[in-house]
Each structure stands twice: as C-alpha cells, then as structure tokens.
Amino acid sequence: MEITFLGTSSGVPTRSRNVSSVALRLPQRAEVWLFDCGEGTQHQLLRSDVKISQITRIFVTHMHGDHIYGLTGLLASCGLAGSGQPIEIYGPPELKDYLKACAKYSHFKLPHHIRFHPIHPGILYEDAEFSVSCNLLKHRIPAYGYRIAESDRPGRFNVEKAKSLGIPPGPVYGELKQGKTVTLPDGRNIRGQDLCGERETGRKVIYCTDTVFCEGAIALSEDADVLIHEATFAHQDAQLAFDRLHSTSTMAAQVALAAQVKQLIMTHFSPRYAPGNALQLDDLLQEARAIFPNTILARDFMTYEVPRRSSD
C-alpha cells in the first residue's frame, strides 16, 4: 500500500500545492484508489508516477468544490481513452446529480463503465483483501471520512517443516498456507497454523477531511497505521476552525492520540501559512508533535509506503 499526495492545499491551489486529492496505490492488484478529486487533479496525476489507467475506485468525502471540481475532467479523459475498465465512484447522493449536470451542459457523455454508489456510514466495499467503510464527520455540509482496512494474512509457510512431516507438495500446501486443518491420506490431521509463522495483521489507512475535531473521526481512526487528517489552521486560529468547522494542527494530533494510530500525516493546509508569513507550516508541525510525536506534513507528490506489521 502506497499513498501519493496529489493535492494538499485547502480551498484554493498555491504555486506549490494543489487542492485535495490522494491516491492509494495497491501494487499487488495493479489498482489505484483515488480519494477526492479537486480541480487540477488530472494534471497532478500526469506529473506523478500514478497511472490514470489503473484508477478503479474514486471516493469523494463531500461536495465542496476543492474536492470535486477535477472529477468531471478526469472522467471525460477516461472515457476518451476508451479503456472500458469499470470505475466505481463513491460519494454523497448529490454527486451523481452533479456529474450528470456537468455532462449535460458541457455536452459529453459520462463513460458507460462508471458505476455510482451513494455513501452511508458503515461498510461500503469489501472483498477478500480489503474493506472500505466510512463515518460521518463534522463539517458545514455532510462530509465523510474513509477507513481502508487490509485483511489479515497468514504468516510465512514453512515448506521444510511440511516436508519433514511427510506432506508432499501439491494443492494441500495452498490450504495449509491459509491456516486450514487438512486430513492426509494416512489419517493425520495437520493444522495449517502450526506450519505458518506469526499472522500478519492487515494495515489500516484513514482519510479524514473536512472536519472539526469530532468523536466520529476518532472512532473511524482507531488503531490505524496511517491517519491522513486535515489541519487547515494553526492552534492560534482555533476560532476560525470552529467557525468554519475545520481542524487545527492540534485537533488532528488529538484525534491521532485518542485513536492510538501509528502515524499521523497532516494535509489540507490554509494558504495563509505560506513561507514568509508570520506563521508557517513548520509551526503547525511543531504544534502537532507536542501532542503526537509521530506526525509529518504532506506535500504534493510525496509518497508514503505503509509498512506491514505483525500481530500485536
């Protein structure tokens, strides 16, 4: 699992930061899942090493323009490319009407292989490898955070031990690797878990924006490997955060601490903290680290590989 930040600015782009979009790359299945698609995201994708052709799912948090204005252009390009690969889109119910209106008035057809899924709190998608769920956050309009959870994996299969027990290679190895108990032709029952190393706990990535500090974000983020959380304002601008229902750096850190996450990555920064101003992003970083030391700042085109972990 690799996270690539395509846009890390709040509201409007700056010279060094585009508006919101994050790509989650899943190399083992050659897929990219996109979270939000602000204006200019297509250009950011072209400047990155993320392949547009691998995008299979797009998750939208809410209907503010800095999170959706790039979606129509991206989908139009996907349609022109003619790959025919299904793209599943998850977002608020209004998103479907928005896309249809854009298509109608700009005279293009939405690609036929796009499927829309209105979101609701709970599990939105699940297969053998991953599940995606969402929870309501606290913003001026309905906004949802997403939790991507990887399934636990069996530990490494000990082939030599299996051979020493007289188990010949074959389909039975596949069952044992999954931790199943199998009965051999001689009547012996062999437990797969006895031939596998420590079970590998699945990784969890959380994407929380836009929101002020809320219990919903904490519940969604519990025991995550990575929490991507908005930090629009510095602590001294907390009143602005409460007025506009955005988070400060310290609010993001408090969510990370309460949820006991392993790594906090802050994003969605107000342009007011640009270099040369009285307060800068390094100040927000220090504020957050005073509460939650494992904090870093996202920047456009930064890639973070989510490390695997063993069972706790």
Swiss-Prot record:
Binds 2 Zn(2+) ions. GO terms for molecular function: 3'-tRNA processing endoribonuclease activity; zinc ion binding. Zn(2+) 1 binds at H62, H64, H139, D210. Its EC number is 3.1.26.11. It comes from Crocosphaera subtropica (strain ATCC 51142 / BH68). Zn(2+) 2 binds at D66, H67, D210, H268. Coiled coil: none annotated. Keywords: Endonuclease, Hydrolase, Metal-binding, Nuclease, tRNA processing, Zinc. InterPro entries: Metallo-B-lactamas (IPR001279), RibonucZ/Hydroxyglut_hydro (IPR036866), RNase_Z/BN (IPR013471). The active site is at D66 (proton acceptor). Pfam families: Lactamase_B_2. Its cofactor is Zn(2+). Zinc phosphodiesterase, which displays some tRNA 3'-processing endonuclease activity. Probably involved in tRNA maturation, by removing a 3'-trailer from precursor tRNA. SUPFAM superfamilies: Metallo-hydrolase/oxidoreductase. This is Ribonuclease Z. The gene is rnz. It catalyses: Endonucleolytic cleavage of RNA, removing extra 3' nucleotides from tRNA precursor, generating 3' termini of tRNAs. A 3'-hydroxy group is left at the tRNA terminus and a 5'-phosphoryl group is left at the trailer molecule.
